[in-house]
Amino acid sequence: MSFTITHRTGDMEVGPSIDGLLALVDELDRDDPEHPDVAVSHESGWTLSAYPEGLIAWENVEQDGEPRHMRHVARERLIELFTEVALGHLETVEREAWAAGYP
């Protein structure tokens, strides 16, 4: 399974180490209103994006479908979810308590 990370600057890395996910989450600590999020994308198009305030969004950017979101997600939980996406465990992420649409 292949995955891509999107840094806060917009730069992308294909197939990075899973160990780099902690550093990706740490990027949320920088103040950058122009680039507010980081993301992990599975090769199938499923993408989990995270914002500094604990907001995350889950959507398939390759297919039509309703995006979903959660608020107040702790950093530790975010790292777990990013890891699940990177490993291709999409059904685990799907089972989360998502709210419909974008916030």
What is each PLM-predicted segment?
Residues M1-H7, G45-V73, E80:
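Intrinsically disordered, low-complexity regulatory segments enriched in Ser/Thr/Pro
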Residues M1-S41, P103:
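Negatively charged, low-complexity tracts enriched in Asp/Glu with abundant Ser/Thr
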Residues H42, Y51-G54, A100-P103:
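Polar/charged, Gly/Pro-rich intrinsically disordered segments
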Residues R68-P103:
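Mixed-charge, Lys/Arg-enriched low-complexity segments
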